[in-house]
């Protein structure tokens, strides 16, 4: 894969006052998406999974345009010239990222070409109409007339008819037509409904899978759409629109506001038009003028548009070209209590590692709460959940059983707003007390609180997680679930629910740190503690695992820690604005990213506390927040300290250690912001963290501080440290 446009900077010029100490946020995100694309090129992955990674990278890029590029364009239109943390104006950032996107899309098309060749070798083929046999042509014509033709709506464009609306991600064919009778010429558009498959499977023969693109089929039978006309020019194009929603603080009815905003979003500003290279110039110019977009919004691609749709091919029954099926385990501690979640949690705090351990435990916890006559109250946050959500069903069942049920439904969850409005109404109809939280703050914390009568007292059971209450995503996202009856944590969670529902500040919180109130200061306090330890000659270390590291204040604190001699290992899946390896500033910081079969999603923070990591003395936290200004200042987030010795060791000695020593699915983040695949050094054993967890699933089953698998991880870490020092 070709080198991308690097963030060119001279390291010798960087100081703690120079904005160049930060990597540009948009560039760093594009580098993450490039890592996803590199998995499409990774021959260790099964072939159809590589095609899926290509689809994911294309979907990611669409969302990047809809939100981030749209945001830059809006700033430019508004005349904003303020610089980003790395010192670039909106216009400079836009120019920078568009150049990077051009490289990324070239790489995507190049990878598709490679994959098509390998797919063909495995009897899977995307053909053009010229490759159809006569039998196939007859079959596909019938398919066209039965399935495609009835839903096509040709739109002619002339001075009498305004340019038609093209929806977000709308895929269309543009045509220059000439009437055979009198050579009258006009332009028409043919939008492709989203209900149509992009790649149509031909009848299977001899275990061969052949597909033809929908637009090729339409082109082949255009005579049915425009009889008595000749096609003089043709090509496909695709539109991407601004899809962000800006919440107005004065909005009185939040549900009504979002319903209206969602309608507006469908007609958002066009931010990108992608044209097929073979489209004639005059057609391209006609569409550009009709949509009234500037030149920078236009992109011409010599290949397939909408690469996200190649995921349709992945579903074919070729399990030999896919990851082997994986069934998550039921946690042993739950099995020991015959599935009784309350009995298991009452005995001891529990940490569960998804997707290696089943998310069904979380669902069952709420189902049992709904059906248990001793449960009197349930409080629940909902940020994202599945279409047929068992979580929502459990809350509805609990309310119908007469229990007091409160649900905090976050309407501002991007691209899930419509679903959350629907869930909120369903819950309210069942008698659930529904809150939407703050208008200006997005509730991102993942919390369940169940209050149960036990004898003469009331006991609170708490679930806290790093991931959403989404059973489908929980099968592919790596996250932590934590169950406890700790009175202080239950007290803090109750305070936070009151804060969200009644705006009562949780000033008496005992253990949990909350954003936007105390989470930032708690992280900074612990970083400063490690700096103090290092300056006093003690050992000092920080481990963090997050999805994004963007916040300038946190990054500068980590720089100061590095300068003081604190050893810092960061596992950052996505955006990382910290620039490692700057002489005198970040020499002691190592940043890596893991991209693999499962999407890394957990947020974990570990501080040495006067000794090296890993250690029983370490301070360990998990939470819902990434290190970004929006998470620290504009969201409701939680940071949960882990005091239970067993749980602390499970998180530190298994999850974090495995992530740090992984050398099979990991990338080093370099000081120019680009990525480099990590390979084992001479004398270093290969280790794949995700495969390790699949083979050794069960944080909740670990009964000793060190079992044989943990000892193995520690040995591998010591090996890695020794090689690093040498």
Curated annotation (Swiss-Prot):
The active site is at 444 (phosphohistidine intermediate). Gene3D superfamilies: Endonuclease Chain A (3.30.870.10), Polyphosphate kinase middle domain (3.30.1840.10), Polyphosphate kinase N-terminal domain (1.20.58.310). One of its GO terms (cellular component) is polyphosphate kinase complex. Keywords: ATP-binding, Kinase, Magnesium, Metal-binding, Nucleotide-binding, Phosphoprotein, Transferase. CDD domains: PLDc_PaPPK1_C1_like (cd09165), PLDc_PaPPK1_C2_like (cd09168). Its EC number is 2.7.4.1. The keyword Repeat does not apply. GO terms for biological process: polyphosphate biosynthetic process. GO terms for molecular function: ATP binding; metal ion binding; polyphosphate kinase activity. Pfam families: PP_kinase (PF02503), PP_kinase_C (PF13090), PP_kinase_C_1 (PF17941), PP_kinase_N (PF13089). Catalyzes the reversible transfer of the terminal phosphate of ATP to form a long-chain polyphosphate (polyP). Belongs to the polyphosphate kinase 1 (PPK1) family. This is Polyphosphate kinase. It comes from Bartonella henselae (strain ATCC 49882 / DSM 28221 / CCUG 30454 / Houston 1) (Rochalimaea henselae).
């Amino acid at each position: 894969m070709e080198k991308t446009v690097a963030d060119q900077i001279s390291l010798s010029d960087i100081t703690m006052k120079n904005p160049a100490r930060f990597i540009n946020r948009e560039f760093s995100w594009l580098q993450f998406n490039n890592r996803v694309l590199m998995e499409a090129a990774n021959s260790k992955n099964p072939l159809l999974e590589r095609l899926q990674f290509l689809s994911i990278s294309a979907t990611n890029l669409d969302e990047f345009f809809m939100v981030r590029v749209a945001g830059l364009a809006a700033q430019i239109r508004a005349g904003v010239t303020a610089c980003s943390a790395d010192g670039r104006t909106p216009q400079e950032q836009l120019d920078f990222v568009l150049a990077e996107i051009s490289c990324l899309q070239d790489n995507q098309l190049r990878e598709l070409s490679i994959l098509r060749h390998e797919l063909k070798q495995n009897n899977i083929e995307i053909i053009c109409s010229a490759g159809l046999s006569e039998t196939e042509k007859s079959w596909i014509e019938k398919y066209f007339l039965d399935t495609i033709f009835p839903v096509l709506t040709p739109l002619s464009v002339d001075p009498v008819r305004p340019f038609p609306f093209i929806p977000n991600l709308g895929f269309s064919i543009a045509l220059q037509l000439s009437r055979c009778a009198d050579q009258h010429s006009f332009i028409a558009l043919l939008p492709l409904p989203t209900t149509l498959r992009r790649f149509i499977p031909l009848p299977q023969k001899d275990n061969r899978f052949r597909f033809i693109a929908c637009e090729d089929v339409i082109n082949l039978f255009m005579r049915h759409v425009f009889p008595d006309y000749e096609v003089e020019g043709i090509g496909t194009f695709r539109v991407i629109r601004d899809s962000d929603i800006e919440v107005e603080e004065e909005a009185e009815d939040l549900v009504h506001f979002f319903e209206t905003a969602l309608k507006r979003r469908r007609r958002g500003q066009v931010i990108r038009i992608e044209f097929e290279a073979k489209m004639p110039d005059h057609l391209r110019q006609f569409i550009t003028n009709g949509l009234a977009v500037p030149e920078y919004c236009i992109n011409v691609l010599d290949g397939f548009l909408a690469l996200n749709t190649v995921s349709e091919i992945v579903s074919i029954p070729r399990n030999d070209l896919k990851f082997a099926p994986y069934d998550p385990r039921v946690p042993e501690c739950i099995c020991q209590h015959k599935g009784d979640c309350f009995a298991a949690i009452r005995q001891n705090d529990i940490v569960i590692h998804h997707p290696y351990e089943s998310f069904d435990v979380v669902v069952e916890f709420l189902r049992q709460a709904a059906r248990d006559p001793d449960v009197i109250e349930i409080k629940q946050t909902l940020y994202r959940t599945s279409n047929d959500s068992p979580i929502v069903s459990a809350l509805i069942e609990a309310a119908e059983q007469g229990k007091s049920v409160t649900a905090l439904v976050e309407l501002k969850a991007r691209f899930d707003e419509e679903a959350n409005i629907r869930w909120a109404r369903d819950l309210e109809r069942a008698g659930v007390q529904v809150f939407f939280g703050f208008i200006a703050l997005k509730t991102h914390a993942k919390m369940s609180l169940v209050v149960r009568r036990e004898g003469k007292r009331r006991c609170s059971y708490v679930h806290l997680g790093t991931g959403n209450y989404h059973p489908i995503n929980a099968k592919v996202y790596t996250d932590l679930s934590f169950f406890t009856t700790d009175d202080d944590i239950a007290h803090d969670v109750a305070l936070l629910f009151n804060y969200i529902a009644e705006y009562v500040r949780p000033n008496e919180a005992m253990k949990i740190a909350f954003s936007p109130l105390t989470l930032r200061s708690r992280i900074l306090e612990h970083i400063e503690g490690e700096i103090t330890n290092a300056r006093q000659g003690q050992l000092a270390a920080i481990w963090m695992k997050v999805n994004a590291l963007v916040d300038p204040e946190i990054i500068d604190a980590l720089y100061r820690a590095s300068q003081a001699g604190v050893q810092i290992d960061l596992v950052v899946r996505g955006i990382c604005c910290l620039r490692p390896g700057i002489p005198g500033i970040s020499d002691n910081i190592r940043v890596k990213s893991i991209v693999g079969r499962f999407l890394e999603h957990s947020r974990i923070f570990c501080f040495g506390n006067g000794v090296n990591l890993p250690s029983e003395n370490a301070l360990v936290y998990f939470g819902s927040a990434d290190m970004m200004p929006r998470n620290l200042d504009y969201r409701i987030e939680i940071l949960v300290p882990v005091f239970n010795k067993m749980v602390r060791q499970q998180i530190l000695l298994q999850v974090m250690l495995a992530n740090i020593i992984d050398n099979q699915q990991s990338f080093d983040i370099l000081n120019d912001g680009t990525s480099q695949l990590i390979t084992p050094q001479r004398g270093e054993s290969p280790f794949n963290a995700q495969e390790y967890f699949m083979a050794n699933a069960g944080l909740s089953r670990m009964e000793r501080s060190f079992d044989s698998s943990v000892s193995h991880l520690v040995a591998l870490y010591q090996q890695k440290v020794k090689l690093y020092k040498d």
